[in-house]
Amino acid sequence: MNQDKIVIKGAREHNLKNISLQIPKNKLVVITGVSGSGKSTLAFDTIYSEGQRKYVESLSAYARQFLQMMNKPDVDAIEGLSPAISIEQKTTQKNPRSTVGTVTEIYDYLRVLFARVGIPYSPTTGLPINSQSVSEISDNIINKNKDNKAYILSPIVRDRKGEYRKEIEELKLKGYQRLKVDGKIYEIDEVPILKKNFKHNIDVLIDRLVIKENIQQRLAESIEVGLTLSDGLIYLENLETNKITTYSSKFACPVSGFSIEEIEPRLFSFNAPMGACEECDGIGIEKYFDDKKIIPDDSRSVLKGAIKPWETKVFGYQKKFFVETISKILKEYKVNVKTPWYKIPQDVQNIILYGDQDNEKKFISSFEGKINFIDRKYSETERWWVQYELEKYLSERDCEVCKGFRLNTKALAVKIAGKHIGEITKKSIDDCFSWFNKLKDNLSNNENKIAEGVIKEIKDRLEFLNRVGLDYLSLARASKSLSGGESQRIRLASQIGSGLTGVLYVLDEPSIGLHQKDNQQLINTLFKLRDLGNTVIVVEHDEDAIKQSDHIIDIGVKAGIHGGEVIAEGNLKKILKSTKSLTAQYLNKKKQIAIPQKRRKFNKNKIFTLQKIKTNNLNNLEVTFPLSNFICVTGVSGSGKSSLIIDTLYKRLDEYFNKSLNREENYFNFKGIKNIDKVIDIDQSPIGRSPRSNPATYTGCFTPIRDWYAGLNESAARGYKPGRFSFNVKGGRCESCEGDGVKKIEMHFLADVYVECDICKGKRYNRETLEVKYNSKSIADILDMTVEEGFDFFSKIPSIKQKLKTLMEVGLDYIKIGQSATTLSGGEAQRIKLSKELSKRSTGKTLYILDEPTTGLHFDDVNKLLKILHTLVDEGNTVIVIEHNLDVIKTADYIVDLGPLGGIKGGKIIGKGTPEDIANIKKSFTGNFLKQILKIKE
């Protein structure tokens, strides 16, 4: 066996055509090729799958039950495999407790650091609080009170209301004779009856003594008794100076009594009861019924359905009563019931939503308010569909108790250099790194010795995150809010931090979402992973990554059935010599994406302006977009691109078109809406969550296919309607598997196994339905065809052919018509959505928004995509793309460049104009790279 190479023999998984190849170990290997050529099939479904399967197989049966079993890929043999780790874009953590800090393990080190050198502070006084042993307390008392008469007191009640008869009786039974009550000493039998509704202080008099050196044993015993009685707290009252000093065996504030039992790493864990905020259980957020969701269109009146929940089936039957009640309130405050909601005075709105708390109006004294009513209904109902319906009106905000820090008061009371752990995690990675660089100066010599190793581990990991362009993120950022590219690079950084060697890493386009400025640092990070003694296989389209890799494997020539072959492999020189390789043709510039000879002009009469933009890190911007243009929004990661386009532009336009009846455009802080009639966000979210969702159902292509089959003579003779050919309803589907085509078998010591349905053989339909055929093909055969095959098959049926044509135009000719939505990548899902829009009739006034549409695309695919997007613009529409790909940016008519950096260091407009304009802006990172591509001289 060759120990220096991974040897693959006869790989036939999916569209791979019995390929055999050798991949060098301990190298950076890039697998490239057009979309659908078989890159991911080779990297993930063959190499990684077999590596993982062999590793899991080596474990005991008991251990295997907790791990996902991988199916054996269709390959004759793979030799020389190492344990494999996959870092995909799809692995974004959905757990709300997962953060950047926990994923990278930085938070674990932070917890240790705060437990070892953190100092607790009193929330009341802001002063540090300390713990002392009995010996330390005794020595302190003797040193500071020598020859003075004093009381040793144990506080039992501190500023609390009550009579405390039972407590005093228990103290009497224990043998205590004197108490100090509200500042006065009493014999225990002579304590006056305490007023129940007044706050009291009760201390047990433990000892009366003159402080001298020779009373150490007696003093220590009294201290120990007092500490035990009051759970770690005693007072020393000097009778000559009348000064009272508080001593604590725990971390306790002498003023407020605030105490911390022990400072251990688990105190700082928001996943442990000891550290988590009691209110939000460590999530950091609370859900509340949002008046903006309950009243989405405030231009409506109460009569016209302003309060949306009353229009639903949950409360619809009570609507008449609700309207009558609110009408009485409005009448009392002299407001017409037909008045739009936004014109109703704020105090009256508050009464309608939250009730009349002060009972100002007797006739509505029992009115609890609509939001309070909905909240109560949500809490009390046991009907899942009612809860589901009401959850639509919930929003999230920071927990009011912990302020979003996730931890309880005790954990947040511990500080290092004036900062608690929550404040550290809220800093950007970059600021956090700077803070730790300066921390040494704020610690004592002893603290530095204790913290040295932990700080090094934290700084190393922060530096890795900086290197891969994630300096703008914070450690507190929830993992579920990260993009696929961000999630992948975070996991990449944590793998480097782990220091593993001899591992096979398989990565899926780690450059996604990364600006060219940070690209080289990412490549250097991959080299570092390789230099640790690992094999790094990367599915990638980035030109720099391909050129700098040790070994390149080009799969092609095209996609689907026309792909699955190794077109070229070897180092860069070898690849460039290949005449068959599309990748080589783009790398040596024989083929390239052309720079437009003429750009569309900025028409001052056809513009759209967004004003007062303060979303996330945007600094009160005003941005003008020229319509009927191809516009690119650029900038480094975290600069505010998505905040501007997705969270502001799309959100405001969507609200205007879909929720408002008669609002003026000034209300939404924009101008020029007359030139836009709809906005469409073509994002990368799945086209469906169920395996039954597929390209045919999403694009509407399946409807004419079912109609066609229902119209065949055989169907007419049998009385079959279009519903007969649906696998979602009873009738034509296989009832054994309910139209899924597979059955789930539960295994006791193995992962669940999905096996082909033995009745329909994976066809989804029953035998009678499958007997209806068109040109010898059943409905199941159609779903199993690729888009390209389907296009040829239905070439004479325009209603079907046209929808399949648009899928081919966006480069998806290789996917199957009935391919499960769960197996599609984000880029494929986005292009399916784009094809659906292309199949609609263009109005010429549509605004299309796309976020990184080149994700997962080869140079040749990008070329095809650009032609489609520019065609949309030629029809009068406007296309705005958020993009890092310079081949796309250079073809733009207009660019809005944000920066200069990410997070709080971003959010500003660095430049706007044509690519040539941006290239001449020295402080623009995007401009610096454009200058090289456009060949603009200084």
Residue ranges and their predicted role:
Residues 1-938:
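Conserved phosphate-binding elements of NTP-dependent enzyme cores
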